[in-house]
Amino acid sequence: MKSVFVCTLVLALAHHAFAGVCDSNVDYNSTLITPCLGNDIIVLWPNYLNFNTYYKCVEFGKPQLMDCPPNTYFTYYFQQCTGCDNFIPAPTCEYLKQTTDVECVPLVKPTTAAPTTLKTTPSKTTPIVTTAPPSTPVPSTIVTNKPDPTTPKTTKPPKVTTTVNPSPPTGTGPATNAPSSDIPLPPIASTVNTKYPTPPGMPPTPPSFGTPPSIVQLQN
């Protein structure tokens, strides 16, 4: 009965002090490590570094970090994620250790270093002027295509064949069988006879005879 009264008092004070506050101002010095043994396996445990997450025992000796839905925070007293209006900061690890098997370890909070402003003095810079050496134009070479020398073709003149008839032998050789110029030539007719005698005419027409008498046939 006494423990129930103490829990009710803690809930009332926490709800009165932190109701409607999503960012808790409670200063936690330690965080818990749950071995997930015994009845602790059915309990959801707070993560003091980030109330958007919590620990759940998926099996004996194996806690797993779970995420709350967006814009919700884990409330240990309700064992669920709630909105800002119903958020209640979790009790300290030392308080939970009195009734559970959790272990408390020192909480190392990340420190945020203050931003440092570095003053920089612009140094005077002297512009460096570089003079480019004069460029010598490179003579351009014009390549011209020279026509190939052509060799004129020489045409050979056609061969001329000369037939030389042998000249008759001259001199004092033996006599040949050449015709003698003393033989007289045959006579040549002065007029060709183109008239031939006309053949005789047709024989005279034979005399005509009278019509023969008709033959009378005798009847038996």
Swiss-Prot record:
Q: Where are stretches of biased composition, namely Pro residues?
A: 197-210
Residue ranges of region Disordered?
Answer: 116-220
Query: Which protein is depicted?
Result: Peritrophin-55
Positions annotated as glycosylated:
29
Function statement = May bind oligosaccharide structures.
One GO MF term on file is: chitin binding
Q: Which UniProt keywords are listed?
A: Disulfide bond, Glycoprotein, Signal
Q: Which organism is it from?
A: Lucilia cuprina
Q: Which InterPro entries match?
A: Chitin-bd_dom, Chitin-bd_dom_sf
Residues annotated as domain Chitin-binding type-2: 33-95
What happens to this protein after translation, modification-wise?
Glycosylated.
Q: Which pairs are disulfide-linked?
A: 68-84
Which tissues does it occur in? Larval peritrophic membrane.
Q: Tell me which positions the record assigns to the signal sequence.
A: 1-19
What would be one Gene Ontology cellular-component term for the protein?
extracellular region
Indicate, by first and last residue, each region the UniProt record lists as having compositional bias (Low complexity): 116-165
